[in-house]
């Protein structure tokens, strides 16, 4: 049977959900093909959304019309701001989720969205004509024709699950791997490599002895992800902290020879920042204990996820390891930990729209691009979906810059540098992180969302009013000069603020940590009518004024630099500071400008600085 749509999405994980929903929202006829409809939105690993860098991605996805934020706000069990005591640039919202509720909400949203249809089958091969995608075939002899195809297959491409010496061809425990499509992608000439990830054991909640374990609470004023969320007052559950110990470590060491990670059974490279417990014991042999979090998987507390205990050790060893840990001495394991190896395609095979360079109209998003994490997948799915629709409409692509969003950092890192290990987002990856805070996501991306038809006009108008109020009041504060007069000193004293000794402007005064929003309203009467969202932005802009200005200067400098032309006869070979790889690629593509050079995979900002210097030296000589 032959069926037609505008866009096909292959895979119903976090990338596939966002890709299909956003494309349908933008008016395309979308069909989602997934192996199991019941697992749409399943959190395969930890029961949490957000975190450092990841919370930023989730909020950016939300502002740009995505679903992850609002689903999380309606399925969370605990909400916290990580790094709350640090500056706003490195804070991250994180939520424990009820995995069942999240999955049900995601699935129902997909099944009830206009312009979006779903079928349960396995994609086996792509149909390509003259270098352009035209459709796919499935395992039940269906043929789907479409102008654009987005592949979001997660860990299912030639997936192999490892538990001890046992191996099974699964894309997730108990689910079939996608071997035919994996082979087809190799035959089409894509650069396919292997990665590995893993998951932790789960234990029955009623078998845990919580006595003596450290209780971990959510925030009193819980943060949320979606700007659409109102009257947020969720019921929150506690997590609990326990630790491994020398006995645990010895059990693991005694069984290194049975660990797939060390026996040569696993070849794929695992996530650097989420290592297995056996890897941690091996690499950090001097540590006497490792922290573990017991996290409820649902509101019923029937199962707990042991965060920090990712493992692929044999079943009997997992039993011994868990029973050596305080609180888990009599724990009943409901699901064992395992490792999974899978195919991914080097993301340098993609453009910044996530379209493949090799096949027109084919987009890749999520773990197939070498990333790890629900949030990274959702961000890519969203951007692939948006760009597929824009391409259908013959409109300009939507590409976020590194100075606009963490999504921009994520995609730029992937397509220019590639990856040889599962890529995870951190705030440290963003050179302009002071401008890319969670708190200003709406102001950074609201204009884009409205232009793309992904934000309601009434809300957008309110947002523009807020932006105008921020700029007008910052200008007023800069012009407001305070002297150490008797009246000023008295008012400062009433607010328990230290006196001023010289002239200062309003911005300098509000840069004080102690000058909270309440004091701002009290001291400067013109700030009193402003809403909290506006006041918060004014406070942050005042506190980090010098650094924010410096980052804006750096952006302007970079934008100016990228406009620099590269002479036709410019010789790249022999320039100190350029790697052999950079020279080879520059000689091959012969970019006409530094901007064109920046679009070449493998060309780094440091390479661009070197080129700029030597172009300048040549002109002057």
UniProtKB/Swiss-Prot annotation:
- What one GO molecular function would you report for this record? flavin adenine dinucleotide binding
- Taxonomically, which superkingdom? Bacteria
Where in the cell does this protein reside? Cytoplasm
Per UniProt, the keywords (alphabetical) are: Cytoplasm, FAD, Flavoprotein, NAD, tRNA processing
Residues annotated as binding FAD are 11-16
Q: Which GO terms describe its biological process?
A: tRNA methylation; tRNA wobble uridine modification
Pfam families, sorted: GIDA, GIDA_C_1st, SAM_GIDA_C
User: Which residues of the sequence carry a binding annotation for NAD(+)?
Assistant: 270-284
* SMART domains recorded: GIDA_assoc_3
* PROSITE patterns noted in UniProt: GIDA_1, GIDA_2
Cofactor(s) listed: FAD
Query: How is this protein annotated for GO cellular component?
Result: cytosol
Complex formation: Homodimer. Heterotetramer of two MnmE and two MnmG subunits.
* Listed NCBIfam families: mnmG_gidA (TIGR00136)
What does the similarity note say? Belongs to the MnmG family.
Q: Which HAMAP family match?
A: MnmG_GidA
What biological function has been recorded for the protein in this entry?
A: NAD-binding protein involved in the addition of a carboxymethylaminomethyl (cmnm) group at the wobble position (U34) of certain tRNAs, forming tRNA-cmnm(5)s(2)U34.
Q: Which protein, by its recorded name, is this?
A: tRNA uridine 5-carboxymethylaminomethyl modification enzyme MnmG
